[in-house]
């Protein structure tokens, strides 16, 4: 009975969900990673990460997260109202990691974030949406944020195919 239950188990959406692979770069949605600890746990699953992060930090400190996974970070794309808190931790503990800041507060900024992440990525890298923050500054909830990420990845894939839609 347990075996059948495990086989039938489907994880909830937006929890380390593979969205697509484009030109050897994997895109993973962990929009549910709404705090630094959850983002840290998510990043430990991948060796080379382009991290899309930011939102409402709710008073969190990101120093431990950046210290722990700084060697995995190939790049960071920041968005959201408290993006500067993460940027400060990166400057203190991983100053050589390329960082792109998306200043728009509109949900469509995710398209820019995904494009910026792809520009930093190499084949074999993982673009990981693990924001470490709440979503309410730009999105209805973490599900909306994850859906916007998936849509932005689809937009990028279509653009790289020459405008074809899937």
Stretch-by-stretch model annotation:
Residues 7-14, 48, 71, 91, ...:
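Generic secondary-structure signature for well-ordered alpha-helical cores
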Residues 150-166:
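Short, flexible loop segments at boundaries between secondary-structure elements
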Residues 139-142:
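Short, solvent-exposed loop/turn segments at secondary-structure boundaries
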Residues 64-125, 164-166:
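C-terminal helical cap/extension that packs against the catalytic core
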Residues 1-73:
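Nucleotide phosphate-binding/pyrophosphate-handling subdomain across enzymes
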Residues 85, 133-137:
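Short glycine-rich, flexible loops that bind phosphorylated cofactors or substrates
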């Amino acid at each position: 009975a347990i075996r059948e239950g495990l086989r039938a188990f489907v994880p909830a959406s937006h929890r380390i969900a593979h969205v697509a692979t484009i030109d050897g770069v994997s895109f993973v949605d962990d929009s549910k990673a709404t705090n630094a600890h959850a983002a840290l746990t998510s990043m430990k699953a991948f060796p080379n990460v382009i991290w899309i992060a930011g939102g409402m930090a709710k008073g969190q400190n990101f120093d431990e997260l950046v210290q722990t996974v700084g060697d995995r970070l190939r790049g960071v794309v920041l968005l959201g109202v408290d993006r500067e808190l993460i940027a400060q931790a990166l400057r203190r503990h991983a100053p050589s990691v390329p960082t792109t800041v998306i200043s728009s507060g509109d949900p469509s900024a995710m398209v820019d974030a995904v494009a910026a992440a792809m520009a930093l990525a190499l084949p074999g890298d993982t673009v990981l949406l693990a924001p470490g923050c709440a979503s309410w500054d730009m999105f209805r909830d973490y599900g909306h944020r994850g859906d916007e990420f998936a849509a932005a990845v689809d937009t990028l894939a279509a653009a790289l195919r020459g405008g074809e839609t899937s």
